Amino acid sequence: MKLISWNVNGLRACVQKGFLDYFHAADADFFCIQESKLQEGQIALDLPGYHQYWNYAGKKGYSGTAIFAKHEPLQVTRGIGTAICDTEGRVITLEYDSFYLVTCYTPNSVSYTHLTLPT
């Protein structure tokens, strides 16, 4: 099984720079992307042999994830059941008979308080 995960930092720009050539050459079973920065309907990818699962952010030009899978899952879950995360399109989970595949784009921790341990 071949899995690729890539933070594309904007899929439209990435497509213009050769993403599809790499995608097809890689021939991965699962291709996960983070930070797609897309809204529904902004791009149509022709990926024969792949099922496409998208989780869009509510905010334009922000976050978003996708999984392109050769194998159709039993179930697809978008989000984790927490409104603050789910409106940002950060998580997709695919359920299969013997495993779960999760792609996650985590928030930047700059705005959070960090625990500093003594040295």
Where are these predicted regions, by residue range?
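Conserved CoA-thioester-binding segment of acyl-CoA-metabolizing enzymes
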Residues: 17-20, 94, 115
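N-terminal, active-site-proximal structural segment of metallo-dependent hydrolase catalytic domains
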Residues: 1-47, 57, 62
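Soluble or luminal CAZymes and related metallo-dependent hydrolases
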Residues: 11-15, 86, 115
